């Protein structure tokens, strides 16, 4: 193992000088002697000098300090020992529950599976959330993005999906907290304990591994923590059981935008010219390296659900725009819908899914989904006429479209289990079968006689009918 010394420190970026014959390779991990600071080599500048990013705080470091090359990339513990534990970017435990006793350690930099290893699946993943199951269904082994600006409900939707899928899913989950709030990470950990997904008494009963690099941490941690979580998920996917099969793994990433942002923070310090809106010129490549590894193989699958922050609600911003290309389903959260008090604030016209195909989901589901979108789109077009001339100027057919669209809009709202503590309303899980039949009946005019208020924040259609009866008797 070669050793060198620090020659320059600028924030999170540190230059280290080695003998010309012992220059470390790109992505090699270096350790600053006498500290627990790890550096990752990013560039070779020539003359034996390498430029690195610190995985942790650079406070207390100074020029001349000795640095040792480990001769290998950053490796993290993988396997059963990670379940129930909270780890940092280097796989070190941060939950004060003792060391992570893992026999295997994998490098966080790995090749994506080759074309012949990959497998695609058309099996649907039921979420119990009406608007998602109907209009942007998820595929098992697919990649899903939750897009939204600040405060429209990305994390709440993510937590509800974890509640509805991970708790009912018999496989394993990995949660990567990338540059998000520590409070949310703490809440998530305690919720998982209450749900029995994390068993502190006996970690072998746990079903989820957690990797956190929160927003108070240096950019190096936030840049690599998504890769750490992904590596742990890949291990579960690729480890074969006695039948030669891997596991079906759920990977939750909150928030993929912070991964991009961490790259932006260090990009200028690494001497790269910024591109559009100040992002790093390597934005598409960095995103591709991460996303191409999140895939399903012949052995097992990774189903990934990623929250994506949208700066200033601009979906054309380079960061969310780059993410769009990699996803199978996009769930777009809208501030306009949130301002109407309709939650989840998912835009039914902007959200898309590759699964929305009659060959995959069946004719009935496809026709109902397109029928709902058609009614909502027509209502959107009529809104301007209503604002100028009023409802009376519309034809009878258009009036009927407006009444049905308003009922559909309200019926797309739903009380969440994770929001029970705030709203006091018990959460509802609605099966796909019930969702399709309910919306088909609304489109067919079966519930034209019910007031639109009855459709708001209801689970199934039976609840709507009961609410309408209650309103009638109260009136």
From Swiss-Prot:
UniProt cross-references to Gene3D superfamilies, sorted A to Z: 2.40.10.170, Bovine Mitochondrial F1-atpase, Atp Synthase Beta Chain, Chain D, domain 3 (1.10.1140.10), P-loop containing nucleotide triphosphate hydrolases (3.40.50.300)
Enzyme Commission number, as recorded: 7.1.2.2
Catalytic activity: ATP + H2O + 4 H(+)(in) = ADP + phosphate + 5 H(+)(out)
Family matches, as SMART domains: AAA
Transmembrane intervals: none
Highest taxon in the source lineage: Bacteria
Binding site for ATP: 148-155
Transport keyword on record: yes
Any one GO CC term of the record: proton-transporting ATP synthase complex
Family: Belongs to the ATPase alpha/beta chains family.
Oligomeric form and interacting partners: F-type ATPases have 2 components, CF(1) - the catalytic core - and CF(0) - the membrane proton channel. CF(1) has five subunits: alpha(3), beta(3), gamma(1), delta(1), epsilon(1). CF(0) has three main subunits: a(1), b(2) and c(9-12). The alpha and beta chains form an alternating ring which encloses part of the gamma chain. CF(1) is attached to CF(0) by a central stalk formed by the gamma and epsilon chains, while a peripheral stalk is formed by the delta and b chains.
Function in brief: Produces ATP from ADP in the presence of a proton gradient across the membrane. The catalytic sites are hosted primarily by the beta subunits.
Name of this protein: ATP synthase subunit beta
Source organism per UniProt: Psychrobacter sp. (strain PRwf-1)
Gene behind this protein: atpD
